[in-house]
Amino acid sequence: MVANDELLTKYLARNKKAVLGEIIATIQQEQNEVIRKKPQHNMIVQGAAGSGKTTVAMHRISYILYNYEQEFAPEDFYIVGSNQVLLNYITGVLPELNVYGVSQMTMEQLFVRLLYEDWDKSWQIKPVVKGVTPAVKGTLVWFKELENFCLRYEYRAIPREDVVIEKTGKVLLDRATIARLLKETKDLSRADKISRLTDYLMARLENELSGKYYSYTQPEKQKLKHYYETYFGKREWKGSVAELYEQFLKEEQEKDFTVEVPEGGYDVYDLASMAYLYKRIKEDTVIREAGHVVIDEAQDFGMMAYASLKYCLSKCTYTIMGDVAQNISDRYGLNDWMELRKLMLPGEFDYFGILQKSYRNTVEISEFATDILYHGSFPVYPVEPIIRHGEPVTVKKCVDFTEQVTQAEQIIKAWQSKGLDTIAVVCIDEAEAEKVTAALQGSVDLNTGDAGKWEIGEGVMVLPLKYTKGLEFDAVLIFNA
């Protein structure tokens, strides 16, 4: 499984195809260490662009399935990616490792899955729109607000007064004991709290019914058992989780939080909040989900998503891969790992690793990117490019959009004349990508894929920035940089 850098250099000397399997046979030592960590513990890996993070994650799944087959089956894994384009390529890599049957989904799709029957198929998943709302909803402060909302709801929903048998005046469960039990179970779901309280109450009732001080007829015993079996579960939320979430949002608006009630769809932080509310308030039957979750491009998600995920999938372990230098959502993504490490790596044997060797970029590209990163306010992890030189990064200044398009046409044609095949024109978002595609189509043969989809293949592709994560190209033109 371990290979040397000479073999990697040989691979890199060839023209790249936009595939993840390019270095699949070239795993080296620092990657091998990550792959072989025990799956019973959580792991976060900071990996430089081109360090093989995604490939390593897939190898790790294969390694675990082979070496821990008594504990893990393919259906025990969830692979979570930031977009469907990346997941499509993961789908192509896994069969090369003899891995089949592993569920793959975006973070949004995972939270929808965790809503079970409460997800209405008429609802839409929408992208996060830049602005104040996601900057608020993506934080741990927001998650704490959600926790407090649930505590207030549970306080109203779960009886806390003395539980007394009317016939005898016997106190089965006093309010102090109820308060103690609720404190001991404060992090559990409403259903789990009720289950603990009910078990405790029914044990007291059985003791009372079999006692010698009072005599109960058989019908009285049955009536009392029937009544107290549901005593703590009578005030459950009857509406949908969407209605509960709307109630929460309106309470937050009254507290001067700048958030909007979603209309027509939910973004990842809405879905994370709703999944948490479902698990905490509505769930009455625990459904077994994954045993190990692999998250790729982890820096794209705010802490709120991880706090919700940890609560909803509390029995799972995690492999989390990302690069904080590639966070394109600075107001709600991760610019450093500090908070996530505190949340997800509490155990003594949990692991934080760094993949600093980059196999994708030339020395010139790595140095250019690193120089930009040092102008930021967040930690910069070292990048060690494999010794492979290329042309320096070129910056072209243009006066307007028309000149940008003209320059792009000339650059692309020059690259193609050199035999470069897989070329990406990277735009800030979908709207700009559509505009640039329309402008270039008359003079450049573009690989546009299916209408309405962002797909990767050979040729010249115009892509939104978020869909280029983890992919490799012969040449890249960053439009309107």
Sequence positions of predicted segments:
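P-loop NTPase Walker
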Residues: 10-124, 468, 476
